[in-house]
Amino acid sequence: MKTTSYYPVIMTDDVAATAAFYKSHFRFEAVFSSDWYVHLQSGEQENVALAVLDGTHSTIPAAARGTISGLLLNFEVEDVDGVYDELVAAGLPVLKELCDEDFGQRHFITADPNGVLIDIIKPIPPSEAFAAQYSSSALPT
């Protein structure tokens, strides 16, 4: 199978508010918009996309309808401290404070209006113990 595109789709009971959240706080733009589905593309990075879907829509098998759970969205950014300041000033909840992790991340965790966790990350050099676990092509510097 050759994958030509990959993006998460968040099932929600409020498509408009969820799409507005990602447009407002994460600089996404709607490239398709209906009352039951909005396809969002990053205004800063064309290969970054996200979609929002009415969790009760008929395209979802009946047994799977509802809202999302068990999902963590990771956004890698260049200036995690700046994004932290921006989102805190905008009133977003901080579920994990900004910190450096030995495994090679400076990050914090917030959430969208549906409770979907959002991890904002800046890769940093890992500790020596964790560096040995990376392949040479994936080691943050």
Model-derived segments and spans:
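Vicinal oxygen chelate
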Residues: M1-Y6, E29-F75, Y84-A111, P123-T141
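Conserved beta-strand-loop-alpha-helix junction that forms the acyl-donor binding cleft
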Residues: T12-D14, D102
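Helix N-cap motif at beta-to-alpha junctions
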Residues: D14-V15, E78-V80
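Conserved active-site tyrosine of GNAT-family acetyltransferases
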Residues: T18-K23, L87, G115
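Short glycine-/small-residue motifs
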Residues: I120
